[in-house]
Amino acid sequence: MYICPHMALKLTTYYKGSDIPDLPGNNFFHSKELFLLYEATPSYTPIYIVATEEQKTLAKILVVIRKNTSLIPFSILNRCDVYGTGEYLDDTIDKETLFGEMLSHFTKEIFREASIIEFRNLNNSLFGYKHFRSNHYFPVN
């Protein structure tokens, strides 16, 4: 669990589907259901980060570590896939700042297990650019 010093924000990381409470939202790519599917699939390790403020869910993001099972030498690199930039459940919050907090949190969390973190299907390629750069991400076409 991480508590952001800038606001009364609490980031909770879930590693087991049985620990995840029922959460609001309708984005399948950041849902408990997809977490459970990945959890039941060999070679995949899902991690779910939920941002709350005073018991209210503000945002959630599902990241998935994919273990490389290839027998080719030097292909033992694990990679992390993230689809989009998460789901935001409160329109009054600064989504980009909240994304920056979640990005910093899970980058530290995941970098121990995955050598590559890739964001896919970004709706707006400039969303969170400042936070990507401050966490040492770089764009690739």
Set out the residue ranges of the language-model regions.
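N-acyltransferase acceptor-side catalytic subdomain
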Residues: M1-N141
